[in-house]
């Protein structure tokens, strides 16, 4: 890691440009990751269950917990799907981490059906803007609680 991202660039372009490049890459990657995590977990409709104080266990089953604590966003946007590597289908990512992201759109149909059958809320925002707005509303609610 250090040699690929720091040593080789320092040798090739000097330490100032290498450091600047490293900082830009780190900032951009951090921005993408933080946006994905915030829009997938910290929005209206997702839950934040606390474990039982005696057993230290979550009440729901693992799969139900994944659905309750996660939201999808911009699932009809091919550009967001490509840019985020399918992480806008975050619920399916949590439920099926070993399945390639190219299958998430099809898997999401199955997950929606199962959620409907078992009366589990499936949180999905049709656009990134709607998810971002929900995130802001949720933060405001947390800040005034």
Predicted regions and their residues:
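Hydrophobic transmembrane helical bundles of multi-pass organellar membrane proteins
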Residues: 1-145
